[in-house]
């Protein structure tokens, strides 16, 4: 069973994690679902992998488990876990003390196999067993300095621009620079000492998972610039065809009005009538029709005021409405394709240059026998996708039965894709796994974290019978006034933000559904309860509003 804990701040997450780990160390669940103590310790810590986000958190978790295990072994009655463990396993204090003492002894004498680490470190350990598959020597080093390697790759690219076979790249760099300047952005071909180097900033995209998830496909398809040239031509064709069709429809609609001696000002609303939209289309503007325009297509009663309905309304409606309907239809799937063409055309030169930088980074890694830390998750993803879990365990020389992932809201999509098959293998053998996190505390988007995994991604991967969800909403840390303040302000903020998002989706004519109640769902468990021990504690909440729009003023005032 995969246990998913959604643990809000101060809800006892640390206590729960430690308890769950110790439960796995001391006992097991039999075929009837009952928990039993091990008769003797069998180095269970070797078959449990607990991962978290930082080295500090890793050390704290190790210390906490050893410390609590020591209390269970030597001062059992004082352990905060002993009563729960006795009830769970149906055993005595002496039995808990005995197995805890033996387990602690085995753990301390086998400490190097105490598998609590950061996600990155675990991935590196696995990769070292697949050096042949990834094309590196067994002695490869992990390179932490992405900027240095990127700068070296760009320097090499610059030095090769005079080569005959790099003429295409030179032209792309020129086009990219021109595009940046025309769009009002700065452009700098700097060197390592300069803070602003446009290509180095662009190369930062290579470490983002939005690129890594499609990297292999991109590199295989873009082997030369002619592919991208053909793509640009196709995107231009899509844009021109859509804009031409839309303008023709606008002109056709205006022609109908002219034949009947009417103009947009004759419709309900006069100069602000819904059909004034036609003028924008005829002028070549591409923007979705308003909700009012959409509502009046197919509804002739809303076209004119009752006292101003022209005698030709029936024939006008029969001629004009089909044209208007076709215009609205343009802003379905055709508009999505058009927008895709417009947006992708803006970045196609950047993509071509990125591919060249990426290939030179790969050359640097092979020449220096290093692997960028930011590449480990992506490379391991390819390894795991090509092999099943038993083979991976065979390669790394150990088998993990139980997985525990802390701070799961900071896990990235690639990292989860690496863990998911291993957890799936664990669940297929009826083992226990644990995920703990809080979407409201996801603060590492700059490191590709994806809070939606905890919100909905994990649940969609497994059957309902394979996982359980629990919201830990008791706050043991804060007094009543703080908890109540947070409940009210964040609950209302989530509701207002969801409404704002829905309005923007509606106004932009985007397809509805994908963001429906997404924010409200993420904050569905925002409400916390106050622990009895904190009900009488006093506290204070102060809210200060700053009128200045300058960030510097905000920082200075908030730190004062």
Name each region found by the language model.
Residues 31-33, 37-38, 42-43, 71-77, ...:
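Short, polar/flexible loop-turn hinges at active-site or ligand-entry regions and domain interfaces
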Residues 2-9, 44, 49-53, 57-58, ...:
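Conserved helicase NTPase motor core
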Residues 121, 134-137, 152, 156-172, ...:
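Accessory nucleic-acid engagement/destabilization modules that flank
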Residues 186, 193-197, 471-560:
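Helicase-core coupling region on the C-terminal RecA-like lobe
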Residues 1-133, 364, 371-374, 379, ...:
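P-loop NTPase Walker
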Residues 111-124, 174-184, 190-210, 352-357, ...:
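Core structural elements
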Residues 16, 20, 60-68, 122-129, ...:
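Alpha-helical scaffold elements adjacent to nucleotide-binding pockets in ATP/GTP-utilizing enzyme cores
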Residues 191-370, 553, 560:
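Conserved ATP-driven helicase/translocase motor core recognized via long
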